């Protein structure tokens, strides 16, 4: 399929090396510090008798608990566990207790929400996000074992100050599923909170190739399509630490910029990096003439999943094949020479599935000092072993790592002292790209819909 988006010109050896600055004095292997690590996940069941009963009944199987996202609020570190048979709780916080596999998890807000048989609780928490009003948003796929639909997908909202469950929003079937292919799978979200009553939630459908937008002002949903959401068959095969697997997944990792209101995203099976400005969505404008998708098809040298944007407009992306974190300052043009690798570790960064940037933390687990600068959290889950089902649970398999954002990008391309001027130039360039590609974009979108 011909793609309509402009591509970054890049040839030969210069292209291959553009994502990392040569002769850098930085030790990329030590850029991110390990905060927590696990051989496998276990839970605070309250008693050993309760734990053994869960094992005997099949409620808990330590070989089936795989993490997918992380976030932090005050002294609570949240970890989501994909719901497989043998997973007792999908939304959790890290407790102060330690088991043989690592720190024990504790269901959030309590064990009652771990039960899901009547569909009133959480089936499988894929991604989570905390907004500026201390609300926790949880994307519940409704799937067990990643493929079996048990309940309709939902959004859950919690008040973190009280741990009260504020709202449960069921996502309509015609929104959650591609009407042509019958496929659907919600795996990622980003939250844009203008105020308490005016919040937009963006969700990625990686199987149905769509972006879903929820507006809490009127409880409305919108399903958007673009060929930039589609997976690229050239990049469906991925290799991590010498182990390969295939995933034909479309749009997955997303991150919202607090500077430009750009929503950045990539299909998992691609080397692309794309974005859409959300200003029209904030005005309830969802028509094709209002929405413009931009980016580059082959700007990365590997696949990417997790993403996050700092308060100064630095986009961080997890680089799958490199076991690394890359960065780009959105005040610069989107070209390979402006991307740089800021962390790389073949052992600790095998598939970065979750990534968050926290502006300030009054308390941080692992440190006696408050974090007053922006701080990055990443979760790595060795996805190649999830897909291939070949974990060795005597090894450390899952990690949460962190770093000060300023220190992470110090002396890199991602630091820019003239951001205000450059952001205007970048926006002007983007406007020109939108105008030049508008006609071709509409044609290609129609072709894509016909292909589906």
Curated annotation (Swiss-Prot):
GO CC annotations? extracellular region
- Judging by the UniProt lineage, the source's domain of life is Eukaryota
UniProt region (Disordered), positions on chain: 416-452
Cleavable signal peptide: 1-17
* Presence of the UniProt keyword Thylakoid in the record: no
How is this protein's function tied to pH?
Optimum pH for protein stability is 4.5. Protein becomes unstable at pH above 10.0.
Please state, per the UniProt record, what induces or represses the expression of this protein: Moderately down-regulated by the ecdysteroid 20-hydroxyecdysone (ecdysterone or 20E).
Q: Does the keyword Signal apply?
A: yes
- Tissue-specific expression: Secreted from the hypopharyngeal glands of the worker honey bee (at protein level); expression peaks at 12 days post eclosion. Expressed in the brains of adult worker bees peaking at 12 days post eclosion (at protein level). Expressed in the spermatheca of adult queen bees (at protein level); Expression levels are higher in mated queens than in virgin queens.
Q: Where, subcellularly, is it found?
A: Secreted
What does UniProt say on post-translational modification here? N-linked core structure contains mannose (which consists of 8-alpha-mannosyl residues, one beta-mannosyl residue, and chitobiose).
Could you list this entry's UniProt keywords, alphabetically sorted.
Glycoprotein, Secreted, Signal
- Going by the UniProt annotation, this protein carries glycans at 145, 178
For this chain, the family text in UniProt reads:
Belongs to the major royal jelly protein family.
* PANTHER family recorded: GH10609P-RELATED, PROTEIN YELLOW-RELATED
Free-text function comment from the UniProt entry:
Highly abundant protein component of royal jelly, a substance produced in the hypopharyngeal gland containing proteins, free amino acids, fatty acids, sugars and other nutrients, which is fed to developing larvae by worker nurse bees. Major royal jelly proteins (MRJPs) are high in essential amino acids and probably have a nutritional function in larval food. All larvae are fed some royal jelly (also known as worker jelly) early in their development but it forms the principal source of nutrition for larvae destined to become queen bees.
Q: What is the recorded name of this protein? A: Major royal jelly protein 2
Q: Which organism is it from?
A: Apis mellifera
This protein's gene is called: Mrjp2
